[in-house]
Structure formats: C-alpha cells, structure tokens
Amino acid sequence: MLSVQPDTKPKGCAGCNRKIKDRYLLKALDKYWHEDCLKCACCDCRLGEVGSTLYTKANLILCRRDYLRLFGVTGNCAACSKLIPAFEMVMRAKENVYHLDCFACQLCNQRFCVGDKFFLKNNMILCQTDYEEGLMKEGYAPQVR
C-alpha cells in the first residue's frame, strides 16, 4: 500500500539511503522513499507519482504490468493443464507456464531446483540426462568442452 505522509523529521530513503527532506514522503513495504526512488523492481518505472498504483509481493515493489506478468492469472499449466491462480508463483520456459510442483522432467519426473539446467524439446521439459539420451537416440551427441 502506498501512503503519502507529511514529513515530521527527515527519514532515510530506502532507495538511495539519503535523507528525505521533501515536504511529503512515500511509504511502501514499511520503508520510506523519495518520489523519484520508488520504482518497480522489474522494469524500473517510477511509482511515486500521484495516481500510480503499486503492488507488493515476495518483498518486491512492482508496477501493475509486472505484477500481473509475474503473479497474475497465467492460464493453464503446460504440464497438468490445470488453471494457475493469480496468487501462485510459477515457472516459465519460453511461452509455457508451470505450477512449481509441475516444473519437472516430463520423462523421469526429476524436480528442478534453482540453477538446474533444463531443456525444452518438442514442448516437453527435460533434465540434462534425458535430453542427452534423446539426442543419442537421434544419432547426435553433443560435444563436451
């Protein structure tokens, strides 16, 4: 929630760490901001202007477009075909969107952790082992460097 409050004593800006000496200051995520410093965490657009709407989730401050892109209704999961609600975190691979629990190799069901390599082949998510085995069956072996 964005609130504009009259400034009683200088507070530090969460964006630039400088004192806020403006007549009004902005408060979001229980932190104070200069008007120019309150920005979307994804696209850096300014959110401190009168009439701007901001959204907060997972300790992020977001504009409407990025909030909906990250957390909005995303359609159906590419793995299970069930609807993904707006409040649920998702994983994406190109244009495909997945529930976190569904983001796994579609051959061996190995779940992926942050930083794991995965491959998208014929609209299927594959782990590195299954991807390379598929390439071997097709007669192509990736070069190891």
Curated annotation (Swiss-Prot):
GO biological process, one term: positive regulation of transcription by RNA polymerase II
Domain of life: Eukaryota
SMART domains linked: LIM (SM00132)
InterPro entries: LMO_RBTN_TF, Znf_LIM
GO cellular component terms listed in the entry, alphabetical order: nucleus
UniProt domain LIM zinc-binding: residue ranges: 11-73, 75-137
Keyword Kinase: no
Gene3D superfamilies: Cysteine Rich Protein
GO molecular function terms attached to this record: DNA-binding transcription factor binding; metal ion binding; transcription coactivator activity
Designated name of the protein: LIM domain only protein 3
Organism this protein belongs to: Danio rerio
